[in-house]
């Protein structure tokens, strides 16, 4: 068992939209990501996702409206719900989701990360 400092982990990388794995439990992964600008519209067929804002704020765009998330807020996006994170400024986000979750869900493009770094 070891303690993890999220701030120190976030300081290890600069890329946006490139999640890093910082922990695993029961088939789930704890991931960190830096968001900036709009991501892509996508959904996940089999996985729910949790987004927790560590620093900054972002909008989770949904087809039926937007949800603003600020530091300290979290949101669970159920499987099958199309969504697009969009951050006006760099935002630090912790995600909790099954290890099988592909960051771009049902879409594969230049933002798709099939192999995630463990930090």
Feature names for model-found ranges:
Residues 34-35, 44-62:
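Short, conserved beta-strand element in jelly-roll/cupin
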Residues 63-79:
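Short acidic-glycine-tyrosine-enriched beta hairpin
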Residues 27-29, 36-38, 55-59, 66, ...:
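Short, charged/polar surface micro-motifs in flexible loops or helix N-caps
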Residues 21, 50, 59, 66, ...:
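Short, surface-exposed charged micro-motifs
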Residues 6-41, 47, 105:
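A short glycine-rich, His/Asp/Glu-containing loop-to-beta-strand
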Residues 26, 54-55, 70-71, 89:
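A cytosolic small-molecule/anion-sensing beta-strand core signal
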Residues 60-61, 77, 82-88, 93-95:
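Short beta-strand His + acidic residue motifs that chelate non-heme Fe in jelly-roll/DSBH
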Residues 2-10, 23, 88-119:
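Double-stranded beta-helix
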């Amino acid at each position: 068992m070891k303690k993890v400092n999220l701030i120190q982990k976030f300081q290890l990388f600069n890329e946006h939209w490139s999640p890093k794995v910082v922990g695993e439990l029961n088939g789930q992964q704890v991931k960190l990501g830096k968001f900036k600008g709009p991501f892509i519209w996508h959904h996940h067929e089999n996985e729910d996702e949790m987004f927790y804002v560590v620093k900054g704020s972002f909008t989770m765009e949904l087809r039926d409206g937007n949800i603003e998330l600020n530091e300290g807020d979290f949101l669970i996006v159920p499987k099958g719900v199309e969504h697009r994170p969009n951050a006006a400024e760099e935002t630090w986000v912790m995600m909790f989701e099954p290890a099988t979750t592909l960051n771009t869900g049902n879409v594969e493009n230049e933002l798709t990360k099939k192999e995630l770094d463990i930090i």
